[in-house]
């Protein structure tokens, strides 16, 4: 019987999901993206060669794996073509191994223009989006006016729909935001230039997945961003526009929740966040700067510096609840080498004095929240590229064990470097 495993971020994204997806894809036949778009960069380092994937599932680097893009993903034709070109220039066969749901909403230039215009208008109150049109594309989906991959099969109808949608967008862009309109003919020509390539990869993703399960094939679901950025369960409104949690798998691919065997939550040994929004354990001192420097904490897609802080067990407990997490993979343990002491946030003190062990949902309720820390001794020894648990410093082992105790969920995989070989699999999700 095949196993279906989900890999998703249990913090604010950038936890190192891409590496772990790539690591485990030698066990699977299918890797599935089910939400988000090209706003999340998954960085893979294999034999020293760096690859950043934004839209195509990380399994594309394994030649026997078929990659699926489910209906929950918003698809930018321009981003897809760019990424395909980069991979194909390296001899990687993409077109025969990538399948796309015809129900994927399309991201087009007017979505990007609206994203930029809104962020500029918000000024210091901006959400901190990547500016790639993700939010506006999801808005079109919910309002039922969006163009989808299926519309590419009827070009005449597509052209008419595009005309109507652009009238709506350009009116706002010109008259409210005072920016240039998006050109209809160029948008149409650019989409039609690549339409045949995209439609040639269309498949019934839901049926394909259920047949794979019936055949006993292993399936891996690749989440983007992180739990605390979920549109419903994250620090709203400082969130992304999709369901980044395990529930998004069912809605974003048509693969029912009872079919999921294991949920692997990815956590850094500390915490980071990109953009605006609450971050209780954020460090503003030299320790935070040192973590950022050692961890090379800059966004894979945007290049923006990430905010850094101590490990927040309160936020991760919320992620455990929402996702039914089976086990964790802890990444970047080596970044904590050399610190005299380390801290774990085990509870929050709210503004009214109440002590809570689970994070608030709305961003407004994080106002004035204070972290309650446990302090543990650090270690001077090197953990970088260590691949046996017994070879780790005792204080590093103690740190991991304390996090397991605080969370009540085991660390099943440990990453001590960026390359796929710099990993300890303590319990294999596909064998669990």
Curated annotation (Swiss-Prot):
Q: How is the cofactor bound?
A: Binds 1 Mg(2+) ion per subunit.
Instruction: Give the top-level enzyme category.
Output: ligase
Q: How does it assemble?
A: Homodimer.
Q: Which residues bind IMP?
A: 14-17, 39-42, 130, 144, 225, 240, 304
The record lists GTP as bound by 13-19, 41-43, 306, 332-334, 415-417
Q: Of which family is this protein a member?
A: Belongs to the adenylosuccinate synthetase family.
- Which residue ranges does UniProt annotate as crossing the membrane? none
Q: Which domain of life is it from?
A: Bacteria
Q: Name one GO cellular component term.
A: cytoplasm
Provide the coiled-coil residue spans: none
Q: Where does Mg(2+) bind?
A: 14, 41
Q: Which Pfam families match?
A: Adenylsucc_synt
Q: Which GO terms describe its biological process?
A: 'de novo' AMP biosynthetic process; IMP metabolic process
User: Which cofactors does this protein require?
Assistant: Mg(2+)
Name this protein carries in UniProt: Adenylosuccinate synthetase
| Residues binding substrate, per UniProt | 300-306
What HAMAP family does the database record attribute to this sequence? Answer: Adenylosucc_synth
List the active-site residues.
Answer: 14 (proton acceptor), 42 (proton donor)
The record's keywords, sorted A to Z, are: Cytoplasm, GTP-binding, Ligase, Magnesium, Metal-binding, Nucleotide-binding, Purine biosynthesis
Which is one GO molecular function term here? magnesium ion binding
Q: Which gene encodes it?
A: purA
List, alphabetically, the Gene3D superfamilies matched.
Answer: Adenylosuccinate Synthetase, subunit A, domain 1 (3.40.440.10), Adenylosuccinate Synthetase, subunit A, domain 2 (1.10.300.10), Adenylosuccinate Synthetase, subunit A, domain 3 (3.90.170.10)
Compartments in which it is found: Cytoplasm
Against SMART domains, the record matches this protein to:
Adenylsucc_synt
EC number per UniProt = 6.3.4.4
Could you tell me what this protein does? Plays an important role in the de novo pathway of purine nucleotide biosynthesis. Catalyzes the first committed step in the biosynthesis of AMP from IMP.
């Amino acid at each position: 019987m095949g196993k279906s495993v989900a890999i998703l971020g249990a913090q604010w994204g950038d936890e190192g999901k891409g590496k772990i997806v790539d690591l485990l894809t030698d066990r699977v036949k299918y890797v599935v993206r089910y939400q988000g778009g090209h706003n999340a960069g998954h960085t893979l380092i294999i034999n020293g060669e760096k690859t950043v994937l934004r839209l195509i599932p990380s399994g594309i680097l394994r030649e026997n794996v078929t990659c699926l893009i489910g209906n929950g993903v918003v698809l930018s034709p321009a981003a897809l073509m760019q990424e395909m070109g980069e991979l194909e220039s390296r001899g990687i066969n993409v077109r025969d191994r990538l399948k796309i749901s015809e129900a994927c909403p399309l991201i087009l230039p007017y979505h990007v223009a609206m994203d930029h215009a809104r962020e500029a208008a918000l000024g210091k109150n901006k959400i901190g989006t990547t500016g790639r049109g993700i939010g506006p594309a999801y808005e079109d989906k919910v309002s039922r006016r969006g163009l989808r991959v299926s519309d590419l099969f009827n070009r005449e109808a597509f052209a008419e729909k595009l005309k109507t949608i652009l009238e709506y967008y350009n009116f706002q862009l010109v008259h409210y935001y005072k920016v240039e309109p998006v050109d209809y003919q160029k948008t149409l020509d650019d989409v039609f230039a690549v339409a045949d390539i995209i439609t040639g990869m269309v498949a019934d993703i839901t049926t394909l997945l259920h047949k794979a399960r019936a055949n006993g094939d292993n399936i891996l679901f690749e989440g983007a961003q992180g739990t605390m950025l979920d549109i419903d369960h994250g620090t709203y409104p400082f969130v992304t526009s999709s369901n980044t949690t395990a529930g998004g798998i069912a809605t974003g691919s048509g693969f029912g929740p009872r079919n999921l065997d294991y949920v692997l939550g990815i956590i850094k040994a500390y915490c980071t966040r990109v953009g605006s929004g609450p971050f209780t354990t954020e460090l503003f001192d030299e320790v935070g700067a040192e973590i950022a420097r050692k961890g090379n904490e800059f966004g894979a897609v945007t290049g923006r510096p990430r905010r850094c802080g101590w490990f927040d067990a309160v936020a991760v407990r919320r992620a455990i609840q929402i996702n039914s997490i089976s086990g964790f993979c802890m990444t970047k343990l080596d970044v904590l080498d050399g610190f005299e002491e380390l801290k774990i946030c085990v509870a929050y003190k709210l503004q009214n004095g109440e002590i809570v062990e689970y994070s608030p949902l709305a961003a407004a309720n994080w106002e004035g929240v204070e972290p309650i820390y446990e302090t543990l001794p650090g270690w001077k020894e090197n953990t970088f590229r260590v691949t046996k648990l017994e070879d780790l410093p005792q204080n590093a082992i103690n740190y991991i064990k304390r996090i397991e105790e605080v969370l009540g969920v085991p660390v099943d995989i440990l990453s001590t470097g960026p390359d796929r070989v710099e990993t300890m699999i303590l319990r294999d999700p596909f064998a669990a």
